Amino acid sequence: MIRTKVAAARWIGRLSRATGRGGGTTLPGRVLLKLDPDAIDKLGASLRNGSTVISATNGKTTTAAMLAAILRAAGREPVHNRAGSNMTWGVATALLEQRGDEGLFEVDEAWLPEVAERLRPKTILLANLFRDQLDRYGETEALADAWVEMAGALADSTSFVLNADDPLIADIGRHTGPSTTYFGIDDDGRAVTEPQHASEAKQCRVCGEPLLYERAFVGHLGHYSCPACGLARPEPDLSATEVKLLGMDGLKATIETATGSHSLDLPLPGLYNLYNALAAIATAQAIGIPPGDSVAALSRMKAVFGRAERIRIGPSELSILLIKNPAGANEVLRTLELEEGPLTLWFALNDNIADGRDISWVWDADFELLSGHVGNVVCSGTRAAEMALRLKYAGWPEQDLTVVRDIDRSLEVVLEDGPERVFALPTYTALLELRELLADQDSATRYWQS
């Protein structure tokens, strides 16, 4: 009976693509789950080598792409929701559309407990939890509580890979089994002494007292301890040292493991991508791939859809950097700070459901970092005026700010003088609009094909 339902859902996917209504990354799964609510359980059980599940607020698409590249280099082709459709229907679509012996699924933070209960994965990577879409998710502690409950239920059957530098994630290790791997950064030169915003401060998950930070790397990720109960950051099994950031050209670091050191040359920018790489290498090790092999595979890594992706449009190179919350935006801004100015920038701030209706997060992002480092700036999207206002208050020259709400027209405006490089910073639905626009112009493939 499941075969008939799968066939019907596959036909829906082919029809969706043929009629130009999308890439068929969600609709087939929605149809299948309507026909059989237990389809994920049944199809997941057919993966002979089990599945790996990845979740995080920031970086899950890139980390999943990194792990997929590592697996392919090892001769293992996973069933993978690579287009980033990461709720139940996206996972179901990947399971019915692809064939393979093991699964690799990025999963939305709120949907993770349900997907994990259905898939019973061999390995779960939990990379970070940041404030994001508060109108949808609520505070991060609520998600952490749900993840703790999930981890306890799976502790006997699932290996966990956890970010030692995120106190919300590391705490989950108190509830997992012995097969738990930690990763983190150990480079004082890339740290500040504490999280930069009060909203990023964290309380001890054991006793509730404020944590003290020895150093912080990205938002609340860092080295911390509790002065009240003695809780401390776990010692990582894999860590990054000797970090050198090269702006948009990538980064270099040494990856320290129990079996030796490996030189990572990653062609993706920023500390956030170093965390993504560490997460992928640690997870690959948990599923049987040596760190040295993973490091070699990542040296050939290409940017995924909208995550430091570069696209040529006539004489201009468009670098696309997704922003969706303060922590992620700050890391993009820190990366751009290393670029030679003045910078040509294109912002697209939307407030659609998939972006989060609440755009107040832009006031917590450090746009002040680029004050005095910018040239032509175009703001677009449904909340273009609010984006321009935020930049004005960040000290960006008002005469350099242009508001063009329409994404199509705004792109024409920012490109009309043929700048050598344009840095595009869209929110999620604006990124989808941008990619479709570029695909219509034959400048890029559609997002589900990238």
Protein language model annotation of sequence segments:
Residues M1-T26, A201, G208, V218-R233, ...:
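ATP-dependent carboxylate-amine ligase
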Residues T57, S85-N86, A258, P269-L271, ...:
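Short, surface-exposed acidic/glycine-rich loop or hinge patches that mediate macromolecular interfaces
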Residues G90, E114-V115, D135-R136, D171-G173, ...:
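Short glycine-/acidic-enriched loop or helix-start segments at secondary-structure transitions
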Residues L67, L71, V91-L95, A277-I287, ...:
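Buried hydrophobic packing segments
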Residues L126, F130-S316:
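Acidic, Mg2+-coordinating active-site environments of NTP-dependent enzymes
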Residues V31, R72, G260, Q285, ...:
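Short polybasic/polar patches that bind polyanions
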Residues R3-Q203:
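Phosphate-binding loop of NTP-binding sites
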